[in-house]
């Protein structure tokens, strides 16, 4: 059974990201890689991975560059210290990459980013900074990054497992500008 992009009347539990009743305490988000049906196959995207993030999804890039379509972050006025929660993870039976199934095994990821939401050119002009789904492929390196909370040992588990990840500010060596922070000039995103 797969998720069909063309089936807008499909039940929500058939989507890659859905609400699920069997959380650690009540409901939870269920993220699952699904087949996309004939429309997805036609555009060379036969699967859709369940994901959840704070930010925006840019539909204009969804088919041509899906990682660029995920715009991470929302303005944030506080210095985050930890990312805490619970997860349960089971890797899929097959791993799809570059147009075919491979022998690789899927690995999940949980992380949060805190970054400068504006940059300035030599003329002093302000440009909004938007980090996207390419960040993990760049080893979480970007000139605007301030801190990262990254799960250190992602693994399969049959039972709910707690995570408590401190934000690493030393990695990027930047000081927080309290005035910019108070004005919401930093952005935060949590990505599953």
Residue ranges: model-predicted function:
Residues 1-82, 105-115, 121-164, 168-192:
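Aromatic (Trp/Tyr/Phe) and Gly/Pro-enriched flexible surface segments
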Residues 79-91:
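A short beta-strand element within beta-rich, extracytoplasmic domains
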């Amino acid at each position: 059974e797969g998720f069909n992009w063309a089936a807008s009347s499909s039940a929500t539990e058939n989507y890659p990201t859905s609400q699920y009743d069997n959380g650690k305490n009540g409901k939870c988000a269920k993220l699952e890689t699904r087949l996309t049906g004939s429309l997805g196959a036609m555009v060379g995207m036969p699967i859709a991975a369940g994901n959840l993030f704070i930010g925006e999804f840019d539909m204009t890039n969804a088919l041509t560059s899906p990682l660029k379509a995920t715009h991470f972050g929302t303005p944030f006025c506080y210095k985050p210290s930890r990312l805490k929660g619970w997860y349960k993870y089971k890797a899929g039976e097959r791993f799809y990459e570059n147009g075919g199934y491979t022998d690789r095994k899927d690995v999940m990821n949980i992380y949060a980013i805190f970054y400068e939401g504006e940059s300035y050119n030599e003329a002093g002009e302000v440009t909004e900074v938007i980090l996207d789904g390419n960040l993990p492929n760049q080893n979480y390196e970007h000139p605007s990054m301030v801190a990262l909370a990254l799960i250190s040992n992602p693994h399969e588990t049959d039972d709910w497992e707690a995570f408590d990840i401190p934000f690493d500010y030393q990695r990027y060596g930047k000081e927080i500008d309290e005035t910019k922070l108070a004005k919401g000039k930093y952005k935060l995103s949590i990505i599953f």
